[in-house]
A protein has these predicted regions:
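Divalent metal-coordination and catalytic microenvironments
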Residues: 24, 34, 44, 60, ...
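Conserved beta-strand hairpin/beta-sheet module of binuclear metal-dependent hydrolase folds
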Residues: 2-51, 157-169
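Short, acidic/turn-prone active-site loops that include or flank metal/cofactor-
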Residues: 37-38, 84-88, 170-171
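Soluble or luminal CAZymes and related metallo-dependent hydrolases
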Residues: 40, 128, 183-187
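Residue-level marker for buried hydrophobic side chains located in beta-strands
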Residues: 31-33, 57, 80, 165, ...
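Metallo-beta-lactamase
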Residues: 135, 141-216
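Soluble, non-transmembrane catalytic domains of enzymes that act on hydrophobic metabolites at membranes
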Residues: 52-75, 132, 146, 181, ...
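Active-site HxH/HxHxD metal-binding segment of metal-dependent hydrolases
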Residues: 46-128
Length: 218
């Protein structure tokens, strides 16, 4: 699925259950943002083969976003990039505790914690540790990394033109909202406020369809 409003790069949303991965392409280069769950790895790999994907960017360390990172990196022979602040989650997603306040958030939290108990991640070592302001143009896409802590300590966004890929810093599972789950509520709200202040951009969520930016917090 593409959202073609205010877009010059090609953005391809790969729906993998309730999780999104994105291929962002510009001419003959592309990056993959998040990798989805194991169940969907072949679907995602086949889509990647339609492009010259040169880099995997993980928005954070939760397994629904990075369970296929090792597999896809090996299959495509490309590096993985993420924040070092989430590396403690790769062997065990329970290493960063999560909280929720809303009724729906508590349901999502319960499902997530059950998944953390039952599922596992194939270990991987990122080639690149990302920090705020890092430039990905060396991989063919004019993208900047934006730190968006709160959902996890190492949550990041990827800003490309007037588009921001936010991972789970914001969510659109049931409706567009701030993150329903967070490691640090104060940091999560600060990140949501920062996104609000970016103005007229398109938001690409880790869960749900893209939306135009809005005021996420007062």
């Amino acid at each position: 699925m593409r959202l073609n409003i205010f877009i010059m790069v090609d953005i391809h949303r790969i729906v993998s259950g309730n999780v999104n991965c994105y291929i962002v392409a510009d001419n003959d280069k592309a990056i993959l943002i998040d990798t989805g769950r194991k169940k969907y790895r072949e679907k995602i790999l086949e889509k990647c083969k339609d492009f010259h994907v040169s880099l995997i960017v993980l928005t954070h360390g939760h397994m629904d976003h990075c369970q296929n990172a090792a597999y896809l990196a090996s299959a495509l022979q490309i590096p993985i990039a993420m924040s070092e602040k989430d590396m403690n989650m790769i062997p065990d997603n329970r290493k960063q505790s999560l909280s929720a306040k809303t009724f729906l958030g508590k349901i999502v939290l319960s499902v997530s914690l059950s998944s953390f108990e039952k599922d596992s991640l194939e270990m991987f070592e990122p080639t690149i540790y990302l920090n705020n302001g890092d430039d990905l143009s060396g991989y063919g896409i004019d993208a900047k990394i934006v730190e968006l802590p709160g959902h996890t300590k190492g949550s990041i966004g990827v800003k490309i033109e007037d588009n921001l890929f936010v991972g789970d810093a914001l969510m659109n599972m049931f409706y567009p909202t701030i993150s329903m789950l967070y490691t640090d509520e104060r940091e999560m709200l600060k990140s949501a406020k920062y996104i609000s202040e970016l103005g007229e951009i398109s938001i690409y969520f880790g869960h749900g369809k893209p939306k135009r930016n809005r005021k996420w917090v007062k």
